[in-house]
Amino acid sequence: MRIQIALVAIAVILIAGENLEAVADSQSSTEDSTSSIVTTKPTLQIEAEYAKYGDYIGLTPVDNQSTEFSQRIVKDIQIRFVNNKDQLLDDKGQPIKGRTQKEFIIGLLKLKPGEVFREDLLKADLQRLRRLESFNEVNVYRQEDANSVNLIYEIKERDFPSLILGGGSNEDVGLFGRLGYKDENISGLNDKLDTTVQISGKDVQFNGQFTSRYRPQEPNRLGYSIRAFRNRNISGTFNEDIRLSNGDKVREGRFGGSVGVLRSFDEWDAAISLNYTRISLRDREYNVAQVDRLGSPLSVSGTGIDDLYTVLFSVSRDQRDRRENPTQGSILTLSTEQAIPIGLGNISSNRLQGDYIQYLPVSWIGNGRPTDNPEMLAINFQIGTIFGNFPPADAFNIGGLDSVRGYGYGKVASGQIYGLASVEYRFPISYSIGGVLFTDFASDFGSSETVLGEPGVLRDKPGSGFGYGLGLRVKSSFGLIRGDLGISDRGELRFEVTTGQRF
């Protein structure tokens, strides 16, 4: 069983305002799935519909009267912050001060003062703010007359910075302690710092990344990201079925960093980065190993160490209703990574990948009940291929908690090409507990034979695999805890626990 626990503070509180017409409810699921709004005009009744977690659907006339709407202008936009007690004022009667700069928030909006009011732009702006990791909850209200509209955003921020303490044990390094620091809103501009240090009796591992996001209000300024990392684990490609000549399992170490720039174009986010990774294969005492027990090479260079210098370009389109535990929408990510033949191994390759996720709300058994685990279908498709020569440790390892459940990590295939399809039916059990029925299928399309040393073929990995099962999702102070019981098409049964949704 692999257990990963991260401390995440999640608070869900509904905000309502007097004399304001609500056009979207909060991300909280504590409200019913519909609510009615009646305008002050006597000739028309307007109803606003809401999905769980506050996804704004729109305004729909409920009678057959013909009505003319004037082109009302957005007169003013106000930003208000609320605290964890759902209050706009502090104990001294002063407005709550948020960390986020109000100019930054307004700069993210498409609907600005002086422009013609449009429902579709308001919906897009609301979803854009809800996808920011620094915000826990976003509401928008409007005040309007015949000619103008005032928009009032009420925002509850997440509790950052946060300090994460943890520890555990694994078969590679034994007992370890972990310290993490995370801030998603540095300088009030949603800049991000995420660092983790893990210390054990065998080594020190770390992962640190700073990201300054692209800001639409500063179109001539590019965002940027800097990362450094060092980690080691049991190899998923060279697993325990064939060990080293001394009987040890193959350990895989990775050390490196990256520097990238970020830019957004309409609804697309793009990134290009320069990356360096040194991959080394080692035994239990972390001595470099060149071949396994059968004499098969572990690296392209033949030394047990390969250097990867790459240029990565990726684009993504995020249309989820929110970033964390989304309830509807989709996200598409496409990437290409070109390796430059420098360093050990002289590696020249191109790695292409695509990832698509769709969230579809359904109402088969939930009946609109308030819940933190709304009923829905979640669908994920992935595909990838590598052209050229590449380290066998960098093959696509299929199988495990984040691919085909019911199999161990890398137990389905280690291939040059892969395709993956997953479907989950998520449904509420109680307010904070949800259930999941899932199925996963993946294949290497026969490409394991083209990987250097054929590690997947020699270890009798099937090349394709199917898994299904059920799981629980529990909303807790640690975040969303996921427990999945998977059954493989070979009859293997595995129960694993981690945090966060599978996708």
Go through the PLM ranges and name each one:
Residues 1-7:
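Bacterial N-terminal signal peptides that target proteins for export
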Residues 7-16:
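Bacterial N-terminal signal peptides
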Residues 87, 114, 160-162, 187-188, ...:
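Short beta-strands and strand-coil junctions in structured, solvent-facing domains, enriched
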Residues 450-503:
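C-terminal beta-signal and terminal closure region of outer-membrane beta-barrel proteins
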